Amino acid sequence: MFEKINYQRRRFLGIAGMTIATTQLGRFGSANAQSSQAKPKESVTPQPGALQSTDPAAIRPFHINIPQADLNDLRQRITATRWSEKETVADSSQGVQLTTMQELARYWATDYDWRKVETKLKALPHFITQIDGLDIHFIHVRSQHENALPLIVTHGWPGSIIEQLKIIDPLTNPTAHGANASDAFHVVIPSMPGYGFSGKPTSTGWGPERMGRAWDVLMKRLGYTRYVAQGGDWG
């Protein structure tokens, strides 16, 4: 049975997501991606010191480096938001209430710590590869347990891979969390097209079926011929 979608939550997150999108946090495209030739193993991942590859289908290491100037510019633009008039009703029937959005903007401009999040992201192995003409960014963490099951996890809308950071260690290292080695997974978490550090589609058509095919290409490119998939919300 499909999980019932909370449309009120979606409306709220949608507006919040669009606000973030217009500010283009850190201009994700400025993150630096480097490429290397993958050495075939059970799972194909770049090896340190490997030769650079010009093949867009190669699995390339991806390094996050958001300039401080971009963060400062983002905060300034959030602070300079010109707000519309207050809604004419006391409930959310006309959308997210103005006071809620203003409080969110205040938090983003003054309290939100991108560097803290960036540090968590940098602690994980990031990669990028081109699939169907689009750069796809993903996290790939292999379990040290034998016979771990490959798992690809897809975030929802609006959302990002940050939602899945907390599940990586319990899935890849279950014995450290009171579970059995037989519960282990090799975890792959891609950013959907147009999200995070993945490329932005320039045409329509990137629906669930096309993304599903792209994810299959990704898993096979990583050397996984047998895997399971998980998604939440619209993931």
Name what the model sees in each region.
Residues 2-20:
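N-terminal secretory signal peptides and thylakoid transit peptides that target proteins
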Residues 20-21, 108-112, 117-235:
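Catalytic cores of eukaryotic secretory-pathway lumenal/extracellular enzymes that build
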Residues 26-67:
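C-terminal segment of N-terminal export signals and the immediately downstream linker at the start
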Residues 79-126:
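An N-terminal hydrophobic leader/cap segment in hydrolases
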